[in-house]
Regions:
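Glycine-rich phosphate-binding P-loop
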Residues: 332
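Extended, folded cores of ATP/NTP-driven motor/assembly subunits in large transport
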Residues: 1-328
Length: 332
């Protein structure tokens, strides 16, 4: 499962037009014109045309396309039911909507997306030609070029023992081009319990070695390295959660993509995002020589090429469930 949270710019001209209230030829046209001017003034000093959207991408493995379609349809209906229970409005995207999302990521200035399925056969083009950027450059270690702009992908190093549900919201409060992606892979419950038991056995073996060393050196065998004692307690607590509290174990990859007009603006945006991570005792680290893989993993395609993962339980992953507040907007 991939969760994507996108802050992107829209075409300012088209966005401004959506605030216009058409005259009706009656005595209230002056009021409509005044109200339109007020809305456009607020737009100029507001969110700078930033639209915030959330996407959930799920992938499966199947023996055939027919089987995959049936399973994907069933899972999609189940997810819509879950969203409805949460009070969240959602719908399954069609092919053109998915292409428009990819186009928006590759064209961060909000250029309008022009596409029709009937254009493919006569033109000899593929869908990739309609969404691809004018240029991509991965010549440096920690940044990349995207159609004359600069981008950088970072991963979140989760160091905090407890996660706050406000961290994701703070990342998305920034009024800049940012794309936050969470790749979540569930681990089989039996395999997860076996893995943790093996870790506990390894820690117990290390504990025995430390005690033998203490006896040979002539000091108290109950004095153990603090890290060893802490890791042992944490592993036993985790095992208890999986066995008694119906928790599952997940592998999480947390990626942050920033895009800006200049290198200096990009540096400021990344620094701001790193400040949010530091606020919650985490660290945002720029990917070294993996910017291309990071960009691919940041697209809502359910593909994760960054194998930097952190194991989390169900309750910890649930912290990143998107909030259900919705921005109300009605054009005209």
């Amino acid at each position: 499962v991939q969760l994507s949270f996108l802050n992107r710019k829209v075409d300012p001209v088209q966005y401004a037009k959506s605030f216009e209230i058409a005259p009706q030829g009656d005595d209230f046209d002056d009021i409509r014109a005044e109200y339109t001017a007020i809305l456009q003034k607020q737009l100029a000093s507001g969110n700078n045309g930033i639209v915030k959207t959330k996407y959930l991408t799920f992938t499966i493995e199947a023996d055939s396309l027919k089987t995959a379609r049936a399973r994907l349809t069933r899972i999609g209906l189940d997810l819509l039911g879950y969203f409805k229970t949460m009070g969240c409005v959602a719908h399954v995207m069609d092919g053109q909507e998915r292409l428009e999302v990819l186009h928006g990521i590759f064209h961060p200035d909000g250029e309008p997306f022009r596409f029709d399925w009937d254009w493919l056969a006569p033109s000899g083009l593929s869908t990739k030609d309609f969404v691809a950027p004018s240029s991509l450059c991965f010549g440096t270690a920690k940044t990349f070029g995207l159609s004359g702009k600069y981008g950088a992908v970072s991963f979140l190093q989760i160091l905090a023992p407890e996660l706050s549900d406000e961290m994701l919201a703070d990342f998305l409060k920034t009024e800049s081009g940012i794309l936050v992606n969470l790749h979540v892979q569930a681990i089989d419950q039996t395999e997860a319990i076996k893995t943790i038991k093996r870790k506990i056995t390894d820690l117990d073996a290390m504990k025995i070695q430390e005690q033998k060393k203490a006896v040979r050196s002539g000091y108290d065998m109950d004095i153990l390295p603090s890290d060893l004692a802490t890791y042992g307690e944490d592993a036993k607590k985790l095992l208890n959660k999986l066995q008694t509290r119906n928790e599952r174990l997940f592998m999480l990859t947390f990626l942050v993509l920033n895009v800006a007009d200049t290198k200096q603006k990009l540096g400021n945006d990344v620094f701001q995002a790193a400040g949010v991570a530091q606020k919650y005792n985490c660290s945002l680290v720029r990917l070294d020589y993996q910017q291309e893989q990071g960009l691919v993993s940041s697209l809502p395609l359910g593909i994760n090429q960054i194998k930097i993962q952190r194991s989390l339980t169900t309750s910890n992953v649930a912290v990143f469930v998107p909030f259900v507040t919705q921005e109300l907007f009605q054009s005209g």
